[in-house]
Amino acid sequence: MRRLILLLADILFLALPAFSQATYQVMDFGAKGDGSTDDAPALQRAIDVCSAEGGGRVVLSHGKTFLSGPLQLKSGVELYLDAGAVLLANPDERIYRLSAFGSNRGEGMLWLWAKDAHDIRVCGRGTIDGNGYGGAFAQYPR
């Protein structure tokens, strides 16, 4: 019985996606986290390096607001938002180049996206703010 339990534990462990323990702080890649500087280049560099080095966790620090345009998520990357961290979509619509609907620009523009990638996580206790307008849903508070 003990052997069976150990065997099942091994199988479950092997079935989980493998995420490296390497940690990449976006501030180390030049992110300001002040809510007005475009941090997309720094965030993308952190994601690229993390994936190229075998994967790990890209951390957005607590108490900071990271303004960002489109980000391509890559294999083996866990995008982790500390409690109190905010990932804020850049409101400048001109910077969004890819549409989920192909050539139909203006609809379904991609902010956080991946292509031919695997083992991606977006998690943590922070906030992802798509910077959308209130519109019809503004009347329904959280």
Locate predicted features.
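Positively charged n-region of N-terminal signal peptides that target proteins for export
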Residues: 1-4
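Bacterial N-terminal signal peptides
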Residues: 7-17
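Extracellular/periplasmic carbohydrate-active domains that bind, remodel
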Residues: 19-142
